[in-house]
């Protein structure tokens, strides 16, 4: 589970660990999908499709202090979940961070 998570989290890439049935995950997907990401730099990882979902959530707990989804990573930094993403978006920090990372098309 640790290797799986670590293989997904990469500098310059936005990765969101999700469960498809979770409304907060869907909201997060909606927000991020509207932004002009460069190809391959936005990934949604469905942890229900893995055999070790609870181990993945345990590792996310270790890594980020919470095992709930969505867990949003901007590069190697976990910014939290859906409400954290919305707060960043409202302050204009989200676009700034994504531009800084080089994740968006010009």
Swiss-Prot record:
Glutaredoxin domain segment(s): 2-105
Disulphide bridges: 22-25, 78-82
PROSITE patterns documented for this protein: GLUTAREDOXIN_1, GLUTAREDOXIN_2
Transmembrane segments: none
One matching Pfam family: Glutaredoxin
GO cellular component entries: mitochondrion
Location relative to the cell: Cytoplasm
CDD domains reported in the protein's UniProt record: GRX_GRXh_1_2_like (cd03419)
Residue list for modification N-acetylalanine: 1
In-chain residues carrying the UniProt-annotated modification N6-succinyllysine: 8
Keyword field: Acetylation, Cytoplasm, Disulfide bond, Electron transport, Redox-active center, Transport
Recorded coiled-coil stretches: none
UniProt similarity note: Belongs to the glutaredoxin family.
NCBIfam families the record matches: GRX_euk
Functional summary from the UniProt entry: Has a glutathione-disulfide oxidoreductase activity in the presence of NADPH and glutathione reductase. Reduces low molecular weight disulfides and proteins.
Protein name as it appears in the record: Glutaredoxin-1
Naturally occurring in which organism (per UniProt): Oryctolagus cuniculus
Gene: GLRX
């Amino acid at each position: 589970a640790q290797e799986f998570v670590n293989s997904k989290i990469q500098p310059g890439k936005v990765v969101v660990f999700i469960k498809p049935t979770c409304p907060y995950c869907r909201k997060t997907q909606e927000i991020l999908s509207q932004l002009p990401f460069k190809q391959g730099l936005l990934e949604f990882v469905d942890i229900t499709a893995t055999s070790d979902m609870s181990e993945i959530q345990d590792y996310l707990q270790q890594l980020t202090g919470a095992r709930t989804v969505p867990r949003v990573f901007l590069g190697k930094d976990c910014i939290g979940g859906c409400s954290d993403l919305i707060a960043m978006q409202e302050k204009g920090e989200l676009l700034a961070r994504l531009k800084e990372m080089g994740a968006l098309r010009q």
